[in-house]
């Protein structure tokens, strides 16, 4: 199990991920900005958070860039536009083939500056409007449309969304119980 070094819990032992891993006797590693994990040809770069946000725990969520020879995924975690701005100002946000939209597509994340810097072909929004009726926020979907980013929303699939990369191009599938179905190219 991996978790971000920066969190607002009283101690590392109070972090829910740490407690869960310890309870199940699973190895646990704290990660921070600048660290990398290699898995075959895949490299996962931890981009942020750069600083602890004591006001909004969402901004302490890990932000990851997963690089493959075929393209890359930027996984924005739950970061809001505050953290986006900090990472953009630090120059650590890369272009990405696929962007996993931050904070479940809420209106406090995935600003124009981030989308302009990343220039993704596809964005994936992990949300459920049954649980959060305000997601995905119109502001977020409008920003993605402004930059001509194709969008997949997890609640539109029975199982999930699958993104495959080949030659710096993403193919995205809606996965239902009867198999996978390609989304618009």
Q: At which residue positions do the language-model features occur?
A:
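Non-globular, low-confidence helical/coil segments that flank catalytic cores
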Residues: 1-185
């Amino acid at each position: 199990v991996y978790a971000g070094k920066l969190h607002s819990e009283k101690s590392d032992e109070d972090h829910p991920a740490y407690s869960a891993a310890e309870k199940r006797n699973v190895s646990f590693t704290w990660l921070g900005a600048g660290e990398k994990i290699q898995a075959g040809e895949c490299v996962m770069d931890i981009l942020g958070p750069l600083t602890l946000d004591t006001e909004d725990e969402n901004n302490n969520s890990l932000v990851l860039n997963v690089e493959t020879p075929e393209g890359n995924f930027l996984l924005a975690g739950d970061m809001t536009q505050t953290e986006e701005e900090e990472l953009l100002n630090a120059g650590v946000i890369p272009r990405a083939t696929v962007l996993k939209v931050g904070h479940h597509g809420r209106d406090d994340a995935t600003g124009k500056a981030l989308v302009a810097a990343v220039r993704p072909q596809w964005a994936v929004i992990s949300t459920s409007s049954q649980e959060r009726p305000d997601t995905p926020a119109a502001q977020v979907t409008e920003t993605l449309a402004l930059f001509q980013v194709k969008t997949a929303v997890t609640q539109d699939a029975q199982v999930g969304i699958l993104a495959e990369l080949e030659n710096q191009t993403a193919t995205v599938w809606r996965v239902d119980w009867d198999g996978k179905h390609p989304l618009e190219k």
